Regions:
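Bacterial N-terminal signal peptides
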Residues: 9-25
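Boundary at the C-terminal end of the N-terminal hydrophobic targeting segment
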Residues: 23-28, 32-34, 39
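Short, hydrophobic/aromatic-enriched beta-strand segments in well-ordered soluble domains
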Residues: 556, 613-631, 654-666
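Aromatic-lined, polymer-binding surfaces characteristic
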Residues: 41, 46-57, 62-65, 74-78, ...
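Extracellular polysaccharide-recognition and catalytic grooves
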Residues: 185-425, 429-436, 572-584, 588-608, ...
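Non-catalytic terminal regions with compositionally biased, polar/charged low complexity
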Residues: 644-654, 660-744
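Positively charged n-region of N-terminal signal peptides that target proteins for export
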Residues: 1-5
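Catalytic and substrate-binding regions of extracellular carbohydrate-active enzymes
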Residues: 357-575, 652, 662-665
Length: 744
């Protein structure tokens, strides 16, 4: 798990080649005297520093960032150096002070190079010498969690983050220090910390974002200390057998499209060490061609991370904090490095939204390009991002219409996402008008808020946020997918059936086996545009096949204020029952419940001046339940959010079908309402011999039909008759429109 945001706005990124190590196999670490013979900076060259110092003030973005950094650091310097004995969890005083210290070390090294002011050197040196006194006295952190506590921080991950930052600041001042001070700092702090990280294989020899930070920290330290052995272990694993290490992580954690296994939130977090260390490798060993590895997957990952956002915020799948977005400092580093290597002017518009850049060679390039007005709009587009190292372990389908703040549908057909993954196969989210409309809870956590259990993941993360009922996908017999075992979940990925993205029809379909014994479910979703509809609509088809009768629940978590319920229901205004006893159900209040029925129903809500009408039905009698999160939550850790749950009892097979329609406008200031009535009159589902058709009947008389074959590989013709009209198509699926007056 991840606790600390990296202060990347000052990260010293690396661009042009600087050959330090030979192409031949690396040898044992050189002697201390040999390492000290050359103290020149290697993470950013002296020539690059000189260019930034002489040219940076000419470019407003760079000059503004430098001024901001100077103001922040001078405030820290005025407060004095504080290197406390570690004692607190995340968010506590000593924890936060050590964070501020690595930020200060990074800033001091940067500003020394940009200004030539030796006061910055003195400040950084004195702080590092205090760490040289403290670090040898430290054992496992007193608040350490799990099997691998850190020394400076309560988890070893944060020690890695400290070193990634501190080593860059140290590299910038190293040649301004005396030999004695260099020896003390390196032998008492930097080398012992790097060796501590390498000595913990349960953290270091892993395929995980924790290990990425660790290998980046040790590898960058190895380059600065001229220690080829440290570099080799960072690249190939502590045993140098290529089973772990940085290169193996690149090969296994990203799909060929650049999608990161743990999802966007953790892609954002891991992006900084991946790119910063890759830059260090490119500088010192350009013959490795690290940015070309796997067809440039690290640079693809930058584009993918921006693509997996809406309204500036990342899609909150898996253990995600909802307020993390493209202005996060890790992506500031990513945009700068990616722009320097690709020259893609569309990345500059992202930099403009971030309102930040690096005080680095890449940051200077971004500032120069922005001053030259080269920025172009970023190309947010529909896409299928394959998951898994070979791209065959499901994927994330993104359907988009009407630009960055238009309509976006995200169908989550990805792998488990390791321990940070949620039990939500074939889950979906929907965005419109800059807002999340069909929502995902993300993580139950208040990051670094000490009053909320020290800022760690709360107990409700396991009891609610990870559970399947907290998401918009199928629940069988009130059990979560894989019975809540993420390691079992890692073994089974969805199968992508098809994906299509045209101007008026975008569609994705996937199948999931093994989430429940004997149950197979398939979800097909489409984003459809039609001239008789005000805005694109979402069509959703969930087909479930089981080998025994079961209870099937299909939740829809939505954002907005309910306007109308198109079904009769029993209400519980005086006393709110709790929906269930476990697997997330214990956290749901039951507010209303309909009787079982087969007729299509509707629910309408209002969000940010726009209406949303959700029409839904099923092939077997179902109940509609209106629920809200927050039950059994004595510490008020959960947000109170509404959901609609469709429930079918005692069936082996069932098909759920629905359409979500955005429409109309409510303006409270001007006191008017336009288009509050749905333009869809009815949604009809019809089953054929080997396919299904969902037909939308519009108020205009037009009809939109989506035909979906059971076998997505079938090339032959399919036919389904709806009220006397035969819909025929070939292949896996087809959209078929009928205008008013078309005969049967």
């Amino acid at each position: 798990m991840r606790l600390q945001p990296l202060s990347v706005s000052l990260v010293l990124a690396l661009t042009v080649p600087f050959a330090l190590l030979p192409a031949a196999p690396l040898l044992a670490a050189p002697s201390a005297s040999a390492r000290q013979a050359d103290a020149a900076p290697v993470l950013v060259t002296a020539a690059q520093w000189q260019q930034m110092a002489s040219e940076g003030s000419r470019y407003p973005w760079f000059a503004k960032e430098q001024a901001r950094s100077q103001k922040t650091l001078q405030k820290m310097m005025k407060a004095g150096i504080d290197v406390p004995v570690p004692r607190d969890k995340g968010g506590g005083r000593t924890h936060e002070q050590h964070k501020r210290n690595y930020q200060a070390l990074l800033a001091a090294g940067t500003l020394y190079r940009l200004t030539g002011d030796k006061a910055y050197v003195d400040y950084a040196r004195d702080m590092l010498l205090q760490y040289a006194k403290l670090y040898p006295t430290l054992g496992p952190h007193p608040e350490g969690r799990g099997q691998i506590p850190g020394r400076v921080f309560w988890q070893v991950l944060n020690d890695s983050v400290w070193l990634v930052n501190a080593i860059q600041g140290y590299d910038a001042i190293r040649d301004a220090l005396s030999t004695e001070d260099r020896n003390t700092i390196e032998s008492k702090v930097l080398r012992p910390m790097a060796e501590f990280l390498v000595s913990e294989p349960k953290n270091y020899d892993q395929i995980h974002n924790h290990a990425t930070w660790a290998v980046a920290a040790t590898g960058m330290t190895g380059y600065v200390l001229r220690d080829p052995e440290l570099v080799e272990k960072s690249l190939r694993g502590s045993q140098k057998n290529d089973q772990f290490g940085f290169l193996r992580q690149i090969d296994l954690l990203f799909s060929p499209d650049g999608y990161y296994e743990e999802g966007p939130y953790y892609q954002r977090y891991a992006l900084a060490p991946f790119l910063l260390f890759a830059n260090a490798i490119e500088r010192n060993e350009p013959q490795r061609k690290i940015f070309q590895r796997r067809d440039g997957v690290l640079l693809k990952a930058v584009d993918v991370l921006v693509q997996t956002s809406y309204g500036g915020l990342f899609f909150p799948i898996n253990d995600a904090i909802l307020d993390k977005g493209i202005d996060t400092e890790e992506l500031v580093a990513g945009i700068g490095i990616a722009y320097a290597r690709t020259g893609d002017d569309r990345l500059l518009s992202v930099a403009q939204q971030q309102k930040r850049l690096l005080l680095s060679p890449e940051g200077l390039q971004v500032a120069q390009a922005l001053a030259a007005n080269k920025a172009k709009p970023f190309d947010y587009r529909p896409m299928l991002l394959r998951d898994g190292p070979d791209g065959d372990r499901g994927g994330l389908a993104i359907l988009r219409m009407n630009g960055e703040r238009g309509q976006a549908l995200v169908q989550k057909d990805t792998m488990q996402g390791m321990g940070h993954g949620h039990f939500d196969k074939l889950n979906w989210l929907f965005y419109d008008k800059g807002n999340p409309v069909v929502t995902d809870y993300g993580a139950a956590r208040f990051l670094n808020v000490e009053a909320k259990r020290g800022g760690i993941y709360l107990a409700e993360n396991r009891s609610w946020a990870k559970q399947t009922v907290a998401h918009n996908t199928l629940v069988v017999d009130e059990q979560s997918h894989f019975k809540g075992d993420w390691k079992r979940g890692e073994e089974h990925a969805p199968q992508v059936r098809f994906f299509q993205a045209d101007a008026d029809t975008q569609i994705a379909s996937a199948m999931m086996r093994d989430a429940y014994p004997g149950v197979v479910f398939t979800r097909t979703q489409a984003l459809l545009r039609h001239p008789d509809l005000a805005l694109p609509v979402v069509l959703d088809l969930m087909q479930v096949h089981g080998d025994k009768t079961a209870r099937y629940d299909l939740p829809l978590h939505f954002n907005g204020h309910i306007v109308s319920t198109g079904f009769e229901a029993e209400h519980f205004p005086a006393q709110r029952p709790v929906l269930g006893a476990d697997n997330g159900y214990q956290h749901l209040w039951l507010d209303a419940r309909s009787k079982p029925g087969s007729e299509p129903r509707s629910l309408a809500w209002l969000l940010d001046g726009r209406f949303y009408t959700y029409r839904f039905g099923s092939s077997a009698p179902s109940q509609a339940l209106l629920v809200e999160s927050g039950a059994n939550d004595p510490e008020f850790n959960l947000r109170r959010e509404p959901a609609l749950l469709q429930r079918v009892e005692g069936q082996k097979d069932v098909t759920f079908f629905s359409v979500l329609e955005p429409h109309g406008e409510y303006n409270g200031t001007a006191e008017y309402v336009h288009g509050a009535d749905s333009r869809i009159r009815e949604v009809v589902r019809t089953r054929g011999s080997d396919a299904e058709v969902i037909e939308l009947r519009l108020a205009s008389g037009a009809r939109i039909a989506l035909g979906v074959a059971d076998d997505s590989s079938a090339k032959g013709e399919h036919s389904v008759t709806v009220d006397g009209h035969a819909y025929r198509w070939s292949g896996s699926h087809a959209r078929i429109d009928r205008s008013k007056g078309d005969g049967k």
